[in-house]
Amino acid sequence: YLHSFLTRRSSDLGLGNRAVTPDALGPYVADHLEVNRHIVKEYGKYAMRTEQLIVLSAIVPGVMGQTGMETAEIVRGIVYETKPDLILAVDALAARNSRRLNRTIQIADTGIHPGSGVGNYRNAMTEESLGVPVIGIGVPTVVDAATIVNDTMENFITALEQSQALRSTGEILRSYSAAEKYEFVKELISPHLNGMFVTPKDIDESVKRLSFTISEGLNIALIDHNIFA
């Protein structure tokens, strides 16, 4: 998939807060990337022993609470100065199904909206706002209380459907869409639980392994992309 977007100049954004483990996926990925822009600028592309070269740079812009600036503002400045042809934005996500926690790697070509998964909406980073294509790569590392209750409710509905006396009730509940059931649960739970997010107990090791998996995949696709030719 990424191979179809490959260009001569790419920039990786390690989005997230390095100090908060579930949100440190992006910075960890940036740590393991084989960046080469500085070498190419100093010695030329032949220093990398190949003409089929993608110039790769990486940045960890931090979060607004650390910098006082919108991440999108920082990125726009970087795009203006370095003029990449493609932005790869890696960020942690909030799951809408607990089974997806630390298990799925999502890729989209529609950009990324930092903080939207936890209700902390920041400026979007898309092709329209930055002027270059933005590939979003993310892994769900947290889940909110409403999702946990909703997953439990799914098991409850299944149990109702298996009961002769309560089957009709289960079928009625099953007729609602996943989004409708989620919103229904969100309205029912206690207000103080709406801002509660949960992460698995092994999140430290999971984030390290996932970040290494993503970074190695990007290194192969971007640095050694000629193996796909």
Residue ranges, per PLM feature:
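Conserved active-site and cofactor/substrate-binding residues in soluble primary-metabolism enzymes
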Residues: 24, 28, 70-74, 82, ...
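Proline-aspartate-enriched helix->loop->beta-strand connector
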Residues: 79, 84-85
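A structural-propensity feature for long, helix-poor, extended segments
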Residues: 49-78
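A generic local secondary-structure boundary/capping motif
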Residues: 46-49, 75-79, 122-127
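A structural signal for small-residue-enriched, beta-sheet-centric alpha/beta enzyme cores
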Residues: 59-60, 89-229
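Gly/Ser/Thr-rich loops at beta-strand to alpha-helix junctions
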Residues: 14-23, 65, 92-97
